[in-house]
Amino acid sequence: MRDVPNIGFISLGCPKNLVDSERILTELRSDGYNIIPSYENADLVIVNTCGFIDSAVQESLEAVGEALKENGKVIVTGCLGAKENQIREVHPKVLEITGPHSYEAVMQHVHKYVPRPERNMYTSLVPAQGVKLTPKHYAYLKISEGCDHRCTFCIIPSMRGDLDSRPIVQILDEAKRLADSGVKELLIVSQDTSAYALDQTKENQNKTVFWNGVPIKNNLISLCEQLATLGIWIRLHYVYPYPHVDNLIPLMAEGKILPYLDIPLQHASPKILKAMKRPGSIDRTLERIKQWREICPELTLRSTFIVGFPGETEEDFQMLLDFLTEAQLDRVGCFKFSPVDGAVATEMAEQVPEEVKEERFHRFMQVQQRISVARLQQKIGKTLAIIIDEIDEYGIIGRSMADAPEIDGVVYVDNISQQAVTVGQIILVTITNADEYDLWGTY
């Protein structure tokens, strides 16, 4: 074995899982291991899995199988790791299996099979912000783990546990390190961002703590107010529509955090929402959306929905289409209901046939596409702040405040010299054209 052991790493799943991968990679680098992006020459391979839906489980199992075939020494972690028996039935030769956010256990297993190397102070230095898998100009910041909801289509609590919020000072310290390292955009993630600190006692929630000499309370609003002082873009994801979310909108209107709200509404039929164990009155939701836009006209609303949930009738589905038309959401994701092993909804009666799910999915997307086209057309002629993600011989590709990386649209700018700008720079672009999802503009 060479002086510095090589660890191969595969990261699957959502941004929350990506943050877990970054934490493990940071621990590996701190311990002196070399991280490589291939099976060849790796002394061990770690696979951080996803287990949210059956297709993700299959992808994870295939990734583990490939790692075993190409390398032979594999440690499995992540959401699917919570189902050890399921993994070992398919891949009995896996060395060790841990559940999600089991950083210490993963490192113990690595040390067991690949002893920790002697540290060289000149080669094993880890940047203050840790190892990041995202481009240097943006990063995901996870503020809590787990979830207290018991949605019938979801098994996240069984894999990641109940809500466990990080201390606010710890979050803010990490955010400042990231900003100091050059990060221009922080994407705040968790299973339920708006529930931040609600798992703590009222005494702890109301307790005054100090950060940078400023007294703050332990809640989401205070967290956002302090993140705003960093002078970078702050984007909120996975914001469950609790009443106190209304208090975030003035911060967006004042330019303290991005006017972008990612709220997973899931459906519009009261019957289906009840079956999903999701709260909320659609009439009240529409009223709140109207109020939010009155306070913050530039607000971008993103949401996700499920079609073909067990018991969904044509009438239920039509309610969803009517809601889309009335709500005029900016960015929307749609998923066909997928059975998940262990989820209550998987065993429900009145399962919707696959061909019906497919047909409803396409109808849903047609309605939302028309809405998206109309809303993006309204941006033509406006000048928007754009953060640059890529620069090539054709121009630049960036994102506006309305666009999160990977899941939303982009802005193309071609009348600009490569030497005039840098990746991560925020520039002003005048929009000249739009299609269903993307914008074009001039600098």
Swiss-Prot record:
Keywords: 4Fe-4S, Cytoplasm, Iron, Iron-sulfur, Metal-binding, S-adenosyl-L-methionine, Transferase
A single BP term in Gene Ontology: tRNA modification
Gene3D superfamilies from the UniProt entry: Methylthiotransferase, N-terminal domain (3.40.50.12160), Nucleic acid-binding proteins (2.40.50.140), tm_1862 like domain (3.80.30.20)
Record GO cellular component, one term: cytosol
Sequence ranges assigned to domain MTTase N-terminal in this UniProt record: 5-115
Details of cofactor binding: Binds 2 [4Fe-4S] clusters. One cluster is coordinated with 3 cysteines and an exchangeable S-adenosyl-L-methionine.
A GO molecular-function annotation: metal ion binding
Positions of transmembrane segments: none
Matching InterPro entries: Elp3/MiaA/NifB-like_rSAM (IPR006638), Methylthiotransferase (IPR005839), Methylthiotransferase_CS (IPR020612), Methylthiotransferase_N (IPR013848), Methylthiotransferase_N_sf (IPR038135), NA-bd_OB-fold (IPR012340), Ribosomal_uS12_MeSTrfase_RimO (IPR005840), rSAM (IPR007197)
Binding site for [4Fe-4S] cluster 2: C147, C151, C154
Pfam families documented for this protein: Radical_SAM, TRAM_2, UPF0004
Protein name: Ribosomal protein uS12 methylthiotransferase RimO
Organism, scientific name: Haemophilus ducreyi (strain 35000HP / ATCC 700724)
